[in-house]
């Protein structure tokens, strides 16, 4: 365990000398190699016990991997064995698509932030499902979330068709499914967070889920991932709509379009969503507002800007039942997982 944890700080300067997306791919490849060689397989069992329940699912601990790091579900076991209590992969779209032109990912180290405009680059639903089926994660009793989106060339008026295809495809292979309507990098996608649009989409998804539950004889929870750049009125509208359509969870939040915290830094004016430290306070606001409106009706997963165990605890104190990591892993490495698990285990005593 210590070899892997000490290796990342040593490797980080070399990784940060690379283009951000290239470094991401190199890191995943090396992590997969470490897993295949057995170097990470004890990490999962090295974490303290911090049992939690999320959307009716039993978690070993409430620290999860956020979607986006493994878009194609090709590294589920390697990533999960870093000590996560649950793993979410995707976003996957019905058809393969290349995403936006490169370069499309930028580091802002002084702000512990990233800007990305990846645009749901992925290999498509069939390849995604094949990767998920090869994983041993769920067969070990671990929790896997599958995140679905719409293709860039699907008109927003027909977005529901893509989500329905995605839901039907991933349903048999998921412990929960996340509906991503908050990426800023797919044109007009965030319009689906609006009251009428959201209600119409979720109504269709709930109807399809009921049919799938009957077909597969099991209930798979549905979560919705929302943006941090919402007004109080928009948050309140979402909080009213989610339980009405039987939604089990809400993931708060995706990346922000705000640039206040990174203004003047290199790459700050690049198009795309900001993740990392600048999102922490924004997501806390959304979590607190959601919890005050939802009560216990819908589970909240807190994500955005967690770079320490303390910040994971702040997400939980704001009203989250679980947290997810992504950008913090890039800046802190795999040691962040254990730090967050320990902080939450201590806080639950």
Curated annotation (Swiss-Prot):
Could you name the Gene Ontology cellular component terms for this entry? cytoplasm; plasma membrane
**Where on this chain does FMN bind?**
67-71, 91, 147, 180, 225, 253, 276, 305, 326-327
Instruction: Please provide the record's keywords in A-Z order.
Output: Cell membrane, Flavoprotein, FMN, Membrane, Oxidoreductase, Pyrimidine biosynthesis
Reaction(s) this enzyme catalyzes, per UniProt = (S)-dihydroorotate + a quinone = orotate + a quinol
CDD domains under this entry? DHOD_2_like
Membrane-spanning segments: none
- Name the residues annotated as catalytic in the UniProt entry: 183 (nucleophile)
- Residues given in the record as substrate binding sites: 71, 116-120, 180, 185, 254-255
- EC numbers for this chain: 1.3.5.2
**Subcellular localization(s) per the UniProt record:** Cell membrane
The answer to keyword Flavoprotein applying to this record is: yes
**GO terms classed as biological process:** 'de novo' pyrimidine nucleobase biosynthetic process; 'de novo' UMP biosynthetic process
Q: Identify which top EC class this enzyme belongs to.
A: oxidoreductase
Superkingdom, according to UniProt? Answer: Bacteria
Cofactor binding note from Swiss-Prot or TrEMBL: Binds 1 FMN per subunit.
What Gene3D superfamilies does this protein's entry cite?
Answer: Aldolase class I
InterPro entries named among the record's database cross-references: Aldolase_TIM, DHO_dehydrogenase, Dihydroorotate_DH_1_2, Dihydroorotate_DH_2, Dihydroorotate_DH_cat, Dihydroorotate_DH_CS
What HAMAP family does UniProt report for this protein, alphabetically? DHO_dh_type2
- Explain the purpose of this protein: Catalyzes the conversion of dihydroorotate to orotate with quinone as electron acceptor.
How does the record describe its quaternary structure?
Monomer.
- Which NCBIfam families does the record cross-reference, listed alphabetically? PRK05286.1-1 (NF003644), PRK05286.1-2 (NF003645), PRK05286.1-4 (NF003646), PRK05286.2-5 (NF003652), pyrD_sub2 (TIGR01036)
| Family under the similarity heading | Belongs to the dihydroorotate dehydrogenase family. Type 2 subfamily.
Q: Which PANTHER family match?
A: DIHYDROOROTATE DEHYDROGENASE (QUINONE), MITOCHONDRIAL, DIHYDROOROTATE DEHYDROGENASE (QUINONE), MITOCHONDRIAL-RELATED
| This protein's name | Dihydroorotate dehydrogenase (quinone)
């Amino acid at each position: 365990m210590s070899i892997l944890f000490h290796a990342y700080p040593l490797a980080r300067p070399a990784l940060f000398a690379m283009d951000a997306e290239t470094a991401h791919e190199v890191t995943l490849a090396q992590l997969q190699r470490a897993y295949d060689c057995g170097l990470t397989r004890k990490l999962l069992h090295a974490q303290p016990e911090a049992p939690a329940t999320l959307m009716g699912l039993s978690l070993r601990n409430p620290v999860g991997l956020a979607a986006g790091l493994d878009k194609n579900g090709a590294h589920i076991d390697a990533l999960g064995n870093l000590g996560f209590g649950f793993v979410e992969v995707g976003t996957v779209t019905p058809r393969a698509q290349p995403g936006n032109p490169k370069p499309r990912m930028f580091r802002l180290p002084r702000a512990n932030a990233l800007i990305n405009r990846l645009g749901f680059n992925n290999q498509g639903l069939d390849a995604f499902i094949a990767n998920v089926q090869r994983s041993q994660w769920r067969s070990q009793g671990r929790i896997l979330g599958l995140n679905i989106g719409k293709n860039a060339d699907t008109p927003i008026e027909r977005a529901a068709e893509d989500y329905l295809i995605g839901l039907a495809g991933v349903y048999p292979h998921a412990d929960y499914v996340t509906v991503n309507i908050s990426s800023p990098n797919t044109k007009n996608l965030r319009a689906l967070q609006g009251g009428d649009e959201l209600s119409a989409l979720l109504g269709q998804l709930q109807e399809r889920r009921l049919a799938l539950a009957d077909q597969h004889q099991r209930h798979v929870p549905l979560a919705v991932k929302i943006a941090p750049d919402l007004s109080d009125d928009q948050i309140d509208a979402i909080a009213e709509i989610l339980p009405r359509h039987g939604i089990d969870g809400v993931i708060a939040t995706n990346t922000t379009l705000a640039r206040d915290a990174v203004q003047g830094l290199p790459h700050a004016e690049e198009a795309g969503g900001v993740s990392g430290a600048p999102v922490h306070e924004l997501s806390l606001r959304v979590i607190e507002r959601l919890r005050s409106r939802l009560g216990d009706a819908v589970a909240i997963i807190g994500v955005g800007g967690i770079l320490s165990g303390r910040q994971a605890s702040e997400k939980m104190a704001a009203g989250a039942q679980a947290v997810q990591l992504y950008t913090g892993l890039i800046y802190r490495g795999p040691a962040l997982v254990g730090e967050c698990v320990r902080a939450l285990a201590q806080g639950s005593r």
